[in-house]
């Protein structure tokens, strides 16, 4: 059984017309989206994905300071979500983080899907981000497991090295998952943005996968990533 998996930080100020067009045309089986803003009627991702036939789990993360909107993680599935849980991760006073877990029934086989968006550290080492990864690893299932999201960490970071010790990173070659035309962080080095990877799909050893694909959808400051898995 083959499944198309997509992970994308769609940016709370992204171009929703471009984002929704891509999501509609790509037709993934399971989708993890970061920076969903459910209380913004101009970009109602939840209603849009429901119309496409997805079940979903929503996990609020934090309040966007400039306008009071709620930024959330969201996981969507074309297959029945049998059980779900939102795991709280270590956080700061103003920046809450979590991981969504969904047990999904794919024609009689249960797969365990986790989606997260870790603390933004401007691509620098951070003990809170590292503790978030440690907490995530503790809750992971051992088999039939998919973990996806914006880890806000580069491949050489402690956080990603820890993930790779426990799961398979389907892409080991240097790639960028940031949109250099839109990614605008005054505290990040603009010279390395075109070669920076922050987004990942990890799998347990028992799941086969194709290569990582990076999508130039241009609606967000991150690029969508996908793979085709076989369970």
Where are the predicted features?
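Active site of divalent-metal-dependent phosphoester/diester hydrolases
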Residues: 41-42, 55-77, 95-96, 153-219
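Active-site-proximal segments of metal-dependent phosphoesterases and phosphodiesterases across multiple
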Residues: 117-136, 155-167
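Acidic, histidine-bearing metal-coordination/catalytic regions of metal-dependent phosphoesterases
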Residues: 1-4, 61-63, 70, 228
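Structured loop/turn residues at beta-strand edges in well-structured enzyme cores
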Residues: 1, 26, 79, 143, ...
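Structured beta-strand-rich core segments of catalytic domains in phosphoester-bond hydrolases
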Residues: 12, 30, 34-111, 118, ...
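Acidic/histidine-rich helix-loop elements
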Residues: 4-13, 37-40, 65-66, 119-126, ...
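Glycine-rich, phosphate-binding/catalytic loops in enzymes
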Residues: 22-24, 47-51, 93, 131-132, ...
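Active-site beta-strand/loop signature of hydrolases that rely on acidic residues for catalysis
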Residues: 5-9, 19-42, 76, 102, ...
